[in-house]
Amino acid sequence: MTATFKAIRNTELPHAFRQVRLELAREPGHPEGDRGIAYVMLAPLDAEGRIDARLWQKHRDACRVVRLRPDVEDERGHLVHRPGGSWAFTYDVAGASPDESGYHFSNERFIPGEYVSIKEADGFHAFRVAAVTAL
């Protein structure tokens, strides 16, 4: 069962919510990175650019992600906070598919030019924070 969404108006969310675009950074097979391999995340960020867990708790349904890949339909999911404090992207609300883990997302700063790691099915990949925009 894939993630389902109800419409949310930007005006219903706190001003801390941002749209964050993460693009694949340079790695073997992608010496220039790849703008087409990306994630677009909607999440509350604190003044330092870190995910605000308190606001996430209050507005968790609004914390969404879209997984972008060339020639593949976009996958829509949610940003989830797991027991122990780790963050992940989940696309399957029934829990049958594995989540994509954000490596140290709780410590990462989501500001343009910074890098974050995401564990996908084939291992960890570095993504560059390409843009952070207010809603």
Model-identified regions with their sequence ranges:
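Short small/polar-residue motifs
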Residues: 6-9, 38, 72-78, 114
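A general structural signal for short secondary-structure junctions and capping/turn motifs
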Residues: 10-14, 79, 108, 118-121
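A generic structural signal for short, non-catalytic loop/turn and secondary-structure boundary residues
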Residues: 13-17, 34, 72, 82, ...
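Exposed beta-strand and adjacent loop surfaces of beta-rich binding modules
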Residues: 19, 86, 115
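Broad, structure-driven detector of short, well-ordered beta-strand segments within folded domains
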Residues: 22, 39-43, 76-81, 127
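Short, conserved turn/kink motifs that form compact alpha/beta structural patches or helix kinks used as
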Residues: 56-109
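Short, compact, well-ordered microdomains
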Residues: 90-135
